[in-house]
A protein has these predicted regions:
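Residue at a conserved register position within TPR or TPR-like alpha-solenoid repeats
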Residues: 44, 78, 114, 148-149, ...
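TPR alpha-solenoid repeat register
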Residues: 70, 140-141, 175, 210, ...
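Short, charge-rich amphipathic alpha-helical segments embedded
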Residues: 51, 55-86, 132-145, 150
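Alpha-helical repeat scaffolds
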Residues: 85-98, 121-131, 155-168, 189-202, ...
Length: 443
């Protein structure tokens, strides 16, 4: 039995619930559990809550292993080339050979496959066109906003579409999410975006991604204590869902904690931030899950990256403690990150104590480790996914640490290096998915 779309409309459930989908693609099946799990999975994909989406798609396939949309969903949330990806691609190809597809099912399948193939611009354009033609297709309208935001559409047109969607569905948490998401990179999020994010989190209080986005916008607005509260709520919600999610894949849970530590630092609660960072560094596992990968890069190095932001050069004991907490395995890319950050921080301490010759030699070590990181660019681009995101963030953190060291060491040219640092900090950090991120470069 297939999972078939019934028509070209999606039903918008009046009442929000964590157990039942809000956006519902009508499917032909004698098993209501299949449709429920499939739509919950598609909602999680929309939010890029990938670890929870995997759970729902697995449940869909347990109900009917011939559900083509569930196989497509699995392709969306597994890295290409992984054993899981190959398994579901093979299953999908076998089903497509004999399938009789309805037009809407064929459209969604082909468009999501276009997305899986990496054609973000084409997929975004397709959903935009569909949302214009089929005004009742709320899911298409949401995908239009999210994908075109990722594709870097700017200006009033996308905001207008998001506002129109929200006017038609004022109590739909996904329409609210779409409007809030558009202010993700704004240095001053609008009142409309903040209100949308708040209402979305209130409608689905058990969804950690919505708390993350609201916390992110609050932090961007300077409302740091409120942001910390939202990150705490996100962590609690994500922890509650670990019964469905392998801890090794718990990206959202870890991002909540990383963002909380970052916000504590930004709020001036530096003791709290450092305490949290050392706690997180103890939660690192060198496994292959996406949560493990995230913590290997971000959790390990967090104490060092916070010390980089300290206005005055840290004491040697603090540097040593942070390096010990990192303890990256020798020969790994993260070890270059660790050694680069340590050398850059030490350079500042040496410069402040006027040991300029030793400081210069130490800075050279930091620059050498950064050079080694740059040599890994091709490998990381081939790996893609979360590894590439973490690698790009590590590069930016190391560059910022070295520029701060140069400012401390080269007094005669510190204005030049400060300009370079300001330029670096003005660039958006590499995106984490879900689409919120802890910012560690800014003091």
């Amino acid at each position: 039995m297939h999972c078939w779309a019934e028509d070209n409309t999606l039903q918008n459930q009046a009442e929000s619930s964590a157990e039942n989908p809000v956006l519902r693609l009508a499917v032909v099946s004698d098993n209501p559990e299949l449709a429920r799990q499939l739509n919950l999975g598609l909602e999680c994909c929309l939010l890029n809550y990938q670890e929870k989406a995997r759970y729902h798609f697995r449940q869909s396939l347990a109900a009917d292993d011939a559900c083509m949309m569930a196989h497509v969903g699995m392709l969306m949330v597994h890295p290409s080339g992984s054993p899981e990806y190959k398994e579901h691609l093979q299953a999908l190809n076998a089903l497509l050979d004999t399938a009789m597809l309805t037009p809407v099912e064929e459209w969604y399948l082909s468009t999501f496959l276009q997305y899986i193939a990496g054609d973000l611009q084409g997929t975004a354009a397709a959903f935009k066109k569909r949302a214009e033609v089929y005004r009742r297709d709320t899911m298409a309208a949401c995908w239009d906003i999210v994908l075109n935001h990722y594709a870097a559409e700017q200006g009033g047109n996308i905001v207008s579409r998001a506002n129109h969607l929200l006017q038609n569905h004022p109590d739909n948490p996904f329409a609210l999410f779409c409007r809030a998401l558009l202010d993700e990179y704004s240095s001053s999020p609008t009142v409309e975006a903040l209100q949308a994010a708040q209402k979305a989190a209130e409608l689905l209080p058990g969804n950690p991604v919505l708390h993350l986005l609201y916390g992110h916008l609050l932090r961007r607005s300077g409302r740091l204590e409120e942001a910390i509260s939202q990150y705490r709520a996100a962590r609690m919600a994500a922890t509650n869902e670990l019964e469905f999610i392998n801890t090794a894949d718990a990206v959202t849970c870890h991002i909540s904690s990383l963002a909380k530590a970052s916000s504590c630092w930004q709020a001036g609660r530096r003791i709290d931030a450092l305490r949290l960072s050392f706690e997180l560094s103890k939660q690192v596992n060198d496994g292959a899950g996406e949560g493990d990968i995230l913590m290997h890069w971000e959790g390990r190095t967090l104490p060092l990256r916070l010390l980089v932001l300290q206005p005055t050069a840290p004491a040697g004991t603090a540097i040593n403690a942070a390096a010990k907490a990192c303890n990256a395995p020798v020969g790994t890319p993260v070890r270059h990150v660790q050694d680069c950050l340590v050398a850059a921080i030490q350079t500042r301490s040496l410069a402040e104590s006027r040991r300029l010759s030793t400081a210069t030699q130490t800075l050279l070590k930091a620059e050498q480790h950064l050079s080694e990181l740059f040599k890994l660019s091709d490998d990381m681009n081939r790996a893609g996914g979360l590894r590439l995101t973490c690698y790009n963030r590590a590069l930016q953190a190391c560059q910022g640490a070295i520029l701060r060291a140069r400012i401390a060491l080269y007094a005669d040219s510190k204005d030049i290096w400060q300009t370079h640092l300001d330029e670096l900090l003005s660039k958006p950090e590499a995106r984490f998915l879900p689409p919120v991120l802890p910012e560690f470069n800014k003091p």
